[in-house]
């Protein structure tokens, strides 16, 4: 949660993420309707860094440590939520966005049945450890978004491929598309991640690839002249549109732990998605 801790530190912190989805899409499974949300979060003017908050000493006895800039101090949080007893200090810390995507059962009152938790961030930590939580308009921006909504899950769509329902989630700041099997909503799992961004390029010069995926459209195989299912991704910052052909769906769950070495990058990503136009 800090851009000043000199490394990747994914863990449990005493904060509450407000989902505030930027995109949502509904689909059917098991006779119910489910809603998939990309939990980006978005502040206006009601936020400050936690280092400037007055924290309740009973709830946060270690406030002095938590509010260090290498801990939670740099993280932006809501200034209008969290003073539960209205005594002028904060009993809870509410941050914008959840850095995740969620699935809600709309046939049963909108109950939450799945949330990806920290997995989207952990995937990036393994796939792009030297560009973790980068901004979308500048390369060489390692961890510049750690204190402010992280990768920012922005876009989401779903599609059926060979009898399986697949969710495609786009990360606006980091870039990249996540594939999840959501056929059984409560037991959804990661399939793959691909990022067409070039971290060695120059964003302003237009040589950094796709930047800022803003929207994703799924085109079923029977509606595509090529006979293959594809997704179309609109990238806000680079102004590019890219088509990805779904080459193959893996059977295995490709969950990954947080890693910080180049040698731990995920493999076989391009087997499942293939870029064929921009």
Please annotate each region the language model reported.
Residues 272-278:
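Short, solvent-exposed loop/linker segments at the N-terminal edge
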């Amino acid at each position: 949660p800090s851009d000043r801790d000199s490394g990747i530190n994914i863990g449990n912190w005493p904060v509450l993420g407000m989902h505030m989805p930027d995109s949502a899409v509904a689909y059917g499974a098991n006779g119910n309707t489910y809603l998939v949300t990309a939990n980006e979060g978005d502040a206006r003017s009601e936020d400050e860094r936690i280092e400037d908050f007055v924290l309740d000493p009973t709830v946060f006895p270690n406030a002095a440590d938590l509010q260090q800039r290498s801990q939670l101090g740099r993280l932006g949080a809501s200034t209008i939520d969290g003073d539960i007893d209205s005594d002028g200090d904060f009993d809870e810390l509410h941050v914008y966005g959840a850095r995740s995507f969620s699935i809600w059962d709309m046939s049963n009152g909108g109950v939450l049945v799945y949330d990806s938790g920290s997995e989207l961030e952990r995937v990036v930590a393994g796939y792009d450890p030297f560009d973790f939580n980068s901004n979308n308009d500048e390369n060489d921006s390692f961890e510049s978004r750690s204190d402010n909504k992280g990768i920012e899950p922005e876009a989401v769509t779903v599609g059926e491929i060979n009898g399986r329902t697949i969710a495609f989630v786009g990360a606006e700041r980091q870039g990249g598309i996540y594939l999840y099997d959501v056929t059984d909503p409560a037991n959804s799992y990661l399939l793959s991640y691909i990022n067409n961004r070039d971290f060695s390029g120059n964003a302003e010069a237009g040589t950094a690839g796709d930047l800022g995926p803003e929207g994703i459209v799924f085109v079923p195989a029977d509606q595509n002249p090529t006979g293959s299912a594809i997704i179309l991704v609109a990238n806000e910052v680079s102004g590019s549109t890219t088509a990805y052909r779904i080459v193959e769906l893996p059977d295995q769950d490709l969950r990954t732990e947080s890693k910080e070495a180049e040698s731990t990058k995920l493999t076989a990503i391009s087997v499942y998605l293939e870029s064929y136009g921009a």
